[in-house]
From Swiss-Prot:
It is found in: Secreted. Residues 91-100 have a biased composition (Basic and acidic residues). The keyword Signal applies. Transmembrane segments: none annotated. This is Alpha-S1-casein. InterPro entries: Alpha-s1_casein, Casein. One of its GO terms (cellular component) is extracellular space. Residues 1-15 form the signal peptide. Important role in the capacity of milk to transport calcium phosphate. It comes from the Eukaryota. Mammary gland specific. Secreted in milk. The keyword Hydrolase does not apply. Residues 67-106 are annotated as: Disordered.
Protein backbone atom coordinates (compact mmCIF):
# COMPACT_ATOMS: atom_id res chain seq x y z
CA UNK A 1 0.00 0.00 0.00
CA UNK A 2 2.82 2.37 0.87
CA UNK A 3 4.52 1.50 -2.37
CA UNK A 4 1.40 2.38 -4.36
CA UNK A 5 1.11 5.78 -2.67
CA UNK A 6 4.79 6.48 -3.30
CA UNK A 7 4.44 5.61 -7.01
CA UNK A 8 1.40 7.92 -7.35
CA UNK A 9 3.24 10.81 -5.74
CA UNK A 10 6.27 10.26 -7.97
CA UNK A 11 4.07 10.18 -11.09
CA UNK A 12 2.36 13.42 -10.08
CA UNK A 13 5.70 15.10 -9.41
CA UNK A 14 7.05 14.03 -12.80
CA UNK A 15 3.87 15.08 -14.60
CA UNK A 16 4.07 18.68 -13.33
CA UNK A 17 5.40 21.14 -15.93
CA UNK A 18 8.80 22.48 -15.11
CA UNK A 19 9.43 26.24 -15.39
CA UNK A 20 12.01 27.16 -18.02
CA UNK A 21 15.47 28.04 -16.80
CA UNK A 22 16.02 31.79 -16.72
CA UNK A 23 18.98 33.99 -16.35
CA UNK A 24 19.78 35.72 -13.08
CA UNK A 25 18.36 39.03 -14.35
CA UNK A 26 15.02 37.46 -15.11
CA UNK A 27 14.90 35.86 -11.67
CA UNK A 28 15.33 39.26 -10.04
CA UNK A 29 12.44 40.78 -12.04
CA UNK A 30 10.21 37.74 -11.62
CA UNK A 31 7.36 39.39 -9.62
CA UNK A 32 7.09 42.24 -12.12
CA UNK A 33 6.98 39.91 -15.10
CA UNK A 34 4.29 37.81 -13.44
CA UNK A 35 2.17 40.90 -12.81
CA UNK A 36 2.64 42.04 -16.40
CA UNK A 37 1.69 38.62 -17.75
CA UNK A 38 -1.37 38.56 -15.52
CA UNK A 39 -2.45 42.02 -16.73
CA UNK A 40 -1.94 41.04 -20.38
CA UNK A 41 -3.93 37.85 -19.98
CA UNK A 42 -6.67 39.70 -18.12
CA UNK A 43 -6.78 42.38 -20.79
CA UNK A 44 -7.02 39.81 -23.55
CA UNK A 45 -9.67 37.74 -21.85
CA UNK A 46 -11.80 40.45 -20.21
CA UNK A 47 -11.67 43.81 -21.92
CA UNK A 48 -12.41 46.63 -19.52
CA UNK A 49 -15.97 47.83 -19.84
CA UNK A 50 -16.68 51.35 -18.55
CA UNK A 51 -19.15 51.35 -15.75
CA UNK A 52 -22.48 53.10 -15.77
CA UNK A 53 -21.28 55.60 -13.18
CA UNK A 54 -18.39 56.59 -15.45
CA UNK A 55 -20.86 57.22 -18.28
CA UNK A 56 -22.96 59.36 -15.97
CA UNK A 57 -19.95 61.32 -14.82
CA UNK A 58 -18.88 61.97 -18.42
CA UNK A 59 -22.37 63.15 -19.36
CA UNK A 60 -22.50 65.46 -16.34
CA UNK A 61 -19.08 66.88 -17.21
CA UNK A 62 -20.16 67.51 -20.81
CA UNK A 63 -23.34 69.24 -19.67
CA UNK A 64 -21.36 71.43 -17.28
CA UNK A 65 -18.94 72.36 -20.05
CA UNK A 66 -21.78 73.19 -22.43
CA UNK A 67 -23.51 75.26 -19.77
CA UNK A 68 -20.28 77.10 -19.01
CA UNK A 69 -19.71 77.81 -22.70
CA UNK A 70 -23.26 79.13 -23.06
CA UNK A 71 -22.70 81.41 -20.08
CA UNK A 72 -19.50 82.78 -21.66
CA UNK A 73 -21.31 83.31 -24.97
CA UNK A 74 -24.15 85.16 -23.25
CA UNK A 75 -21.68 87.40 -21.42
CA UNK A 76 -19.89 88.16 -24.67
CA UNK A 77 -23.09 88.93 -26.51
CA UNK A 78 -24.36 91.16 -23.67
CA UNK A 79 -21.19 93.24 -23.69
CA UNK A 80 -21.20 93.63 -27.50
CA UNK A 81 -24.00 96.20 -27.82
CA UNK A 82 -26.82 97.71 -25.79
CA UNK A 83 -29.46 96.92 -28.43
CA UNK A 84 -28.65 93.25 -28.26
CA UNK A 85 -28.85 93.46 -24.47
CA UNK A 86 -32.36 94.87 -24.67
CA UNK A 87 -33.36 92.20 -27.22
CA UNK A 88 -31.80 89.36 -25.21
CA UNK A 89 -33.32 90.59 -21.95
CA UNK A 90 -36.77 90.84 -23.57
CA UNK A 91 -36.41 87.32 -24.97
CA UNK A 92 -35.16 86.02 -21.64
CA UNK A 93 -38.06 87.67 -19.80
CA UNK A 94 -40.50 86.14 -22.28
CA UNK A 95 -38.90 82.70 -21.84
CA UNK A 96 -38.84 83.12 -18.07
CA UNK A 97 -42.51 84.13 -18.06
CA UNK A 98 -43.40 81.03 -20.06
CA UNK A 99 -41.35 78.89 -17.67
CA UNK A 100 -42.74 80.66 -14.59
CA UNK A 101 -46.41 80.18 -15.52
CA UNK A 102 -46.58 76.59 -14.23
CA UNK A 103 -44.37 77.40 -11.29
CA UNK A 104 -46.53 80.41 -10.36
CA UNK A 105 -49.69 78.32 -10.50
CA UNK A 106 -47.94 75.71 -8.38
CA UNK A 107 -46.86 78.38 -5.89
CA UNK A 108 -50.45 79.68 -5.76
CA UNK A 109 -51.65 76.17 -5.03
CA UNK A 110 -49.06 75.80 -2.27
CA UNK A 111 -50.06 79.13 -0.73
CA UNK A 112 -53.70 78.01 -0.72
CA UNK A 113 -52.70 74.79 1.01
CA UNK A 114 -50.66 76.74 3.55
CA UNK A 115 -53.65 78.99 4.33
CA UNK A 116 -55.88 75.94 4.73
CA UNK A 117 -53.36 74.28 7.04
CA UNK A 118 -53.02 77.48 9.07
CA UNK A 119 -56.79 77.56 9.56
CA UNK A 120 -56.75 73.94 10.65
CA UNK A 121 -53.92 74.61 13.10
CA UNK A 122 -55.76 77.63 14.53
CA UNK A 123 -58.92 75.54 14.99
CA UNK A 124 -56.95 72.80 16.73
CA UNK A 125 -55.26 75.39 18.96
CA UNK A 126 -58.65 76.89 19.90
CA UNK A 127 -59.99 73.42 20.71
CA UNK A 128 -57.03 72.66 22.95
CA UNK A 129 -57.39 76.01 24.72
CA UNK A 130 -61.08 75.37 25.34
CA UNK A 131 -60.36 71.88 26.68
CA UNK A 132 -57.69 73.13 29.05
CA UNK A 133 -60.06 75.85 30.31
CA UNK A 134 -62.79 73.25 30.90
CA UNK A 135 -60.37 71.03 32.75
CA UNK A 136 -59.30 73.93 34.97
CA UNK A 137 -62.93 74.75 35.80
CA UNK A 138 -63.74 71.16 36.74
CA UNK A 139 -60.67 70.90 38.94
CA UNK A 140 -61.46 74.16 40.74
CA UNK A 141 -65.14 73.28 41.25
CA UNK A 142 -66.39 76.27 39.24
CA UNK A 143 -69.59 75.94 37.22
CA UNK A 144 -69.23 75.03 33.58
CA UNK A 145 -69.65 77.73 30.98
CA UNK A 146 -72.11 77.33 28.15
CA UNK A 147 -70.84 75.82 24.94
CA UNK A 148 -71.68 77.18 21.50
CA UNK A 149 -73.43 74.94 19.03
CA UNK A 150 -70.38 75.01 16.77
CA UNK A 151 -68.13 74.00 19.62
CA UNK A 152 -70.60 71.41 20.93
CA UNK A 153 -69.84 69.30 17.89
CA UNK A 154 -66.22 68.98 18.97
CA UNK A 155 -66.44 68.96 22.77
CA UNK A 156 -68.05 66.75 25.36
CA UNK A 157 -68.75 67.79 28.93
CA UNK A 158 -66.36 65.99 31.23
CA UNK A 159 -67.91 63.82 33.94
CA UNK A 160 -67.62 64.85 37.55
CA UNK A 161 -64.55 63.35 39.08
CA UNK A 162 -65.45 62.15 42.57
CA UNK A 163 -61.95 61.05 43.39
CA UNK A 164 -60.67 64.62 43.61
CA UNK A 165 -61.10 65.57 47.26
CA UNK A 166 -60.05 69.19 46.88
CA UNK A 167 -62.62 69.98 44.21
CA UNK A 168 -65.72 69.43 46.42
CA UNK A 169 -66.78 70.38 49.95
CA UNK A 170 -65.96 68.10 52.84
CA UNK A 171 -67.52 64.61 52.76
CA UNK A 172 -69.80 65.24 49.77
CA UNK A 173 -67.69 62.91 47.69
CA UNK A 174 -68.23 60.11 50.20
CA UNK A 175 -71.98 59.75 49.76
CA UNK A 176 -73.46 58.22 46.62
CA UNK A 177 -75.56 60.48 44.41
CA UNK A 178 -79.15 61.03 45.61
CA UNK A 179 -80.70 61.20 42.19
CA UNK A 180 -81.41 57.83 40.62
CA UNK A 181 -82.35 57.69 36.97
CA UNK A 182 -85.87 56.22 36.63
CA UNK A 183 -87.21 54.75 33.40
CA UNK A 184 -89.59 56.96 31.45
CA UNK A 185 -93.30 56.18 31.67
CA UNK A 186 -94.06 57.22 28.10
CA UNK A 187 -93.19 53.76 26.82
CA UNK A 188 -96.13 52.07 28.60
CA UNK A 189 -98.56 50.68 26.00
CA UNK A 190 -102.21 51.73 25.95
CA UNK A 191 -104.55 49.52 27.97
CA UNK A 192 -106.73 47.21 25.91
CA UNK A 193 -110.33 46.15 26.67
CA UNK A 194 -112.71 43.80 24.89
CA UNK A 195 -115.18 45.57 22.62
CA UNK A 196 -118.30 43.74 23.89
CA UNK A 197 -117.32 43.72 27.48
CA UNK A 198 -119.52 45.43 29.99
CA UNK A 199 -118.08 46.44 33.28
CA UNK A 200 -114.83 44.64 33.21
CA UNK A 201 -111.68 45.80 34.78
CA UNK A 202 -109.05 47.10 32.40
CA UNK A 203 -105.66 45.64 33.00
CA UNK A 204 -102.64 47.23 31.36
CA UNK A 205 -100.29 44.94 29.49
CA UNK A 206 -96.74 45.23 30.68
Amino acid sequence: MKLLIFICLAAVALARPKPPLRHQEHLQNEPDSREELFKERKFLRFPEVPLLSQFRQEIINELNRNHGMEGHEQRGSSSSSSEEVVGNSAEQKHVQKEEDVPSQSYLGHLQGLNKYKLRQLEAIHDQELHRTNEDKHTQQGEPMKGVNQEQAYFYFEPLHQFYQLDAYPYATWYYPPQYIAHPLFTNIPQPTAPEKGGKTEIMPQW
